[in-house]
């Protein structure tokens, strides 16, 4: 049962990009809907818990949530540039590299020689995996430009996701205490990021995208439980498995086309990212 709970984040976060893509809408509509869904879920959690708030917890969690919106909105943009099956392994790999480097240099993780060797070996595998998943066999000017745009977009996205994780870690804020102020930060930032655009912000797709927002929040809550049930290392490692669902789902359910060579390299790349993520989880323990 503990492992089942620990797998919920991977399932929720793996399916979420597929649901967002199926619902459709522009990135601004997707980020607003997703953050509204996360806020609704956070309010429900707040009612049944007793979080302890201080000014630091509220402000830092709010800013952390704003960084998440920066990360998520740019991930949505990358879906339109390179597709879900390329975006998710690239995004996951970049996030793992970013959060791990912060962990080493800011929080002095991997405190032994063996953990440093394991951790940096993991980063090497992840970087190789990133390159493999981004491979294009038949390049034309348009696809090449889209890939460049996608990588730049995902670098910005990763800054947002890393900031989201690092801020609460820096101030040693419990995930339970952070949930509501984080969600408020997500909504405010999502609304601000979506101001400069001609498309309507509130459409049918906006409200439907509350569903993946609830899915993301469910995965986040399950991760808090799984960290207690199976430990941070195992919980973290299992949560990375969602990239398999989103990558394969992008190909099978969203119809994203790959040549045979691209498909093989994507699978190898995803496996390397997962192995690297698992190794990082072990190094954290």
Swiss-Prot record:
GO terms for molecular function: carbohydrate transmembrane transporter activity. The keyword Transmembrane helix applies. It is found in: Cell membrane. Keywords: Cell membrane, Membrane, Sugar transport, Transmembrane, Transmembrane helix, Transport. One of its GO terms (cellular component) is plasma membrane. Pfam families: Sugar_transport. The keyword ATP-binding does not apply. The chain crosses the membrane at residues 5-24, 31-48, 53-71, 84-106, 116-135, 151-173, 178-195, 207-226, 232-254, 263-282. Its main location: membrane. It is a multi-pass membrane protein. InterPro entries: Sugar_transport (IPR010651). Belongs to the GRP transporter (TC 2.A.7.5) family. This is Putative sugar uptake protein lmo0169.
């Amino acid at each position: 049962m503990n492992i089942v709970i620990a797998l919920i984040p991977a399932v929720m976060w793996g399916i979420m990009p597929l649901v967002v893509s199926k619902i459709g809408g522009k990135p601004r509509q997707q980020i607003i809907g997703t953050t509204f869904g996360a806020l609704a879920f956070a309010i429900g959690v707040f009612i049944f818990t007793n979080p302890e708030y201080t000014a630091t917890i509220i402000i830092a969690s709010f800013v952390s949530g704003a960084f998440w919106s920066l990360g998520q909105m740019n991930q949505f943009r990358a879906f339109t540039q390179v597709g879900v099956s390329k975006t998710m392994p690239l995004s996951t790999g970049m996030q793992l590299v970013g959060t791990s480097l912060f962990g080493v240099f800011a929080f002095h993780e991997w405190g032994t020689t063996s953990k440093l060797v394991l951790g940096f070996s993991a980063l090497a595998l992840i970087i190789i995996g990133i390159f493999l998943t981004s491979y294009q066999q038949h390049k034309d000017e348009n696809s090449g430009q889209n890939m460049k745009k996608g990588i730049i977009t995902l670098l910005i996205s990763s800054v947002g996701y890393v900031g989201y994780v690092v801020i609460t870690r820096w101030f040693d804020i419990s995930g339970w205490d952070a949930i509501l102020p984080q969600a408020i930060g997500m909504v405010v930032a999502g609304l601000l990021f979506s101001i400069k655009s001609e498309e309507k912000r509130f459409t049918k797709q906006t409200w439907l995208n509350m569903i993946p927002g609830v899915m993301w929040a469910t995965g986040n809550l399950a991760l808090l439980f799984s960290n207690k049930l199976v430990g941070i290392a195992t919980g973290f490692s299992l949560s990375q498995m969602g990239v398999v669902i989103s990558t394969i789902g992008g190909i099978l359910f969203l119809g994203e086309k790959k040549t045979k060579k691209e498909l093989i390299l994507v699978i190898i790349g995803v496996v390397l990212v997962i192995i690297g993520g698992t190794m990082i989880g072990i190094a954290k323990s």
